[in-house]
Amino acid sequence: MMDQARSAFSTLFGGEPLSYTRFSLARQVDGDNSHVEMKLAADEEENVDNNMRGNHASVPKPKRCNGFICYGTIAVVLFFLIGFMIGYLGYCKRVEPKAGCERPTGTEALGTERTEPSETEEYFPETPSRLFWTDLKTMLSERLSNTDFTNTMRWLNENSYVPREAGSQKDESLALLIENRFREFQLSKSWRDEHFVEIQVKSSNAQNTVTIVDMESDLVYLAESPEGYVAYSKATTVTGRLVHVNFGTKKDFENLKSPVNGSLVIARAGKITFAEKVANAQSYNALGVLIYMDQARFPIVNARIPFFGHAHLGTGDPYTPGFPSFNHTQFPPSQSSGLPSIPVQTISRAAAEKLFENMEGDCPSAWEIDPSCRLETSSNKNVNLTVNNVLKEIRIFNVFGVIKGFEEPDRYVVIGAQRDAWGPGAAKSSVGTALLLELARIFSDMVLKGGFKPSRSIVFASWSAGDFGAIGATEWLEGYLSSLHLKAFTYINLDKAILGTSNFKVSASPLLYSLLEKTMKDVKHPITGQSLYRDSNWINKVEKLSLDNAAFPFLAYSGIPAVSFCFCEDTDYPYLGTTMDLYENLNQKIPQLNKMARGAAEVAGQLIMKLTYDLELNLNYEMYNDRILSFVRDMNQFRTDIKEMGLNLQWLYSARGDFFRATSRLTTDYKNAERTNRFVMREINDRIMKVEHNFLSPYVSPRDSPFRHIFWGSGSHTLPALVEHLKLRQKNKSAFNETLLRNQLALATWTIQGAANALSGDIWDIDNEF
């Protein structure tokens, strides 16, 4: 058959036997085996020679005119087809309709097959057309101006979903509703995960009580049987004299004239978390803690309003420290070191005033406190505190929705809000949840109808059990500890975003400072119309993320840059954590609530767009140069002490210098990078997004010291702890531990050096003589 075909083809081109070889017209892609056979001159000569030898006869050469004409015709046709295909494909890329170039139903593009895209093609899809930044800002603003946030807040505070304590039926119902909303918004995907965690609640069989004991008459007076409580308090009974410790900060305890050893203490709410107040009291050997809301700071008319909090000096489920509480997890018999060993209870202002009636000594005027305040109980009076809280296992749901990125879907920014609340939770959880839902709807609409094509993915998260120490968020982080820092590059927290109108406050990782400054310059205050950027010195006013902020575990535990912001006043919002945290009270306190919500949504929205729009990640790694330099300056104050121990700071100076050079080199690499080369840009972005994670100390266990960040974490491995330890040598040398100090200095230095090495890139690019 082949011989016959060859003979016929030979006859067609002048009767000359021909030989062919395979030659690809185009570069082979994904194993394409399409070829055109071309005649080779060498083969022709060899074939002629063979024929002459085989036949022993001379064969006259045929005329070649017809063959040249055919070859020319084929070449012209081929060049025409190739030109047509190049023009067609170029037109497709420029026009970019929704589903590629339109073609009749059931047909495919010429010369293509129905094959699955290769992994490389799927990982780096074709670059979508990009809108200008000004167009995106306008698109976001227009959609925000047509959004009624207060309507969403209102239905979140309907009786169907209030109160919604973590694990309750109403909390679960709202979780399912949010998941359905994500589906209605046509997000790329929505899902939920469940955790089984232990929380502490009030006992249904025994009351918590605070009583006054008259030691002379043995009479006992009930001050209060509080409705509120503090989760994770030790369940026990203690009796002793009562001492006022102002807010219960470390400085407050240091300034006390009366010792609290063997006594109960009473502290005002505010300034620091309940857990920190209890930890400070415990460090001074107090027996127990009472917390109340004074009228000077919390001007609530009703003096009997109960309130709630937790005393766990940490985040997540304290009975599964460092590992996730999924249903299949085999829970070891362990608990967090942050659990208190003393009882703690919230009391109403009315109960506190009863206690003050049995105390003596005026409180210092510097405290700026109610005139009824007294310092300590009289010599013949004691206070008895009984806490009967019990543990309860609950199931909680975290709900997620994602808009997948068009170029790097495996890199994502996470935006989240707490869903649960003890009490109505209007300001505490409804505001954040409303912002989350509306932003998910708006961004989905921008993608589906507005032409916005984010390069990276946007994940929307609704957390449960936030009131018990960001349990939902922390358990999720623990569940994906080994991979999240490689994928999630920023967390934006929406909790308590609107508590007032006067100020705009931010707590964030230094990596986000530059992005925040750009955003503040772009966004106007919803009421005054002035730029949110008012002070060039704003960075020095940034507050550290607190333990009760859901952004804290992202930064300190997982090493993911995080930001939390709020419109608020200089004073505390009075109803947080109380039964008066109602929508009506929030709307009364902030009459222009909808405008403020639009402003908060615009801040979050611009952050999201900037983080998913630009080629380079908007994370300013150079900001940590200032942080490291500040630490080195602090250490220089103790050069004499360090020298007396036979140590020096040369290694620290070297590590600091290497980090500075690494940041400079990365900046140079970025400036010289080819923007259209996605592989190069991705490699640079990967180095940037790992900076925060590289400051997690690799020398401590996530289980024993979960907050491993040397700048923002807690524990002896942190840089602030190292400085405090050196201060202790000057104040109380007998309490100083030189062996610990040597370890602290060495491990801190190596952590900074490791961060510098990682930022430098490949090992052959690391240039240091450490």
Curated annotation (Swiss-Prot):
One of its GO terms (biological process) is intracellular iron ion homeostasis. GO terms for cellular component: external side of plasma membrane; melanosome. A lipid is attached at C65, C70 (S-palmitoyl cysteine). Residues 579-770 are annotated as: Ligand-binding. Keywords: Cell membrane, Disulfide bond, Endocytosis, Glycoprotein, Host-virus interaction, Lipoprotein, Membrane, Palmitate, Phosphoprotein, Receptor, Signal-anchor, Transmembrane, Transmembrane helix. The keyword Disulfide bond applies. Residues 1-70 are annotated as: Mediates interaction with SH3BP4. The chain crosses the membrane at residues 71-90. It is a single-pass type II membrane protein. It comes from the Eukaryota. GO terms for molecular function: transferrin receptor activity. Residues 1-70 are cytoplasmic. The modification Phosphothreonine is found at T21. It holds the Pfam family Peptidase_M28. The modification Phosphoserine is found at S10, S19, S24. It is found in: Cell membrane; Melanosome. Belongs to the peptidase M28 family. M28B subfamily. Canine and feline parvoviruses bind human and feline transferrin receptors and use these receptors to enter and infect cells. Homodimer; disulfide-linked. Binds one transferrin molecule per subunit. Interacts with SH3BP4. Interacts with STEAP3; facilitates TFRC endocytosis in erythroid precursor cells. This is Transferrin receptor protein 1. It comes from Canis lupus familiaris. The gene is TFRC.
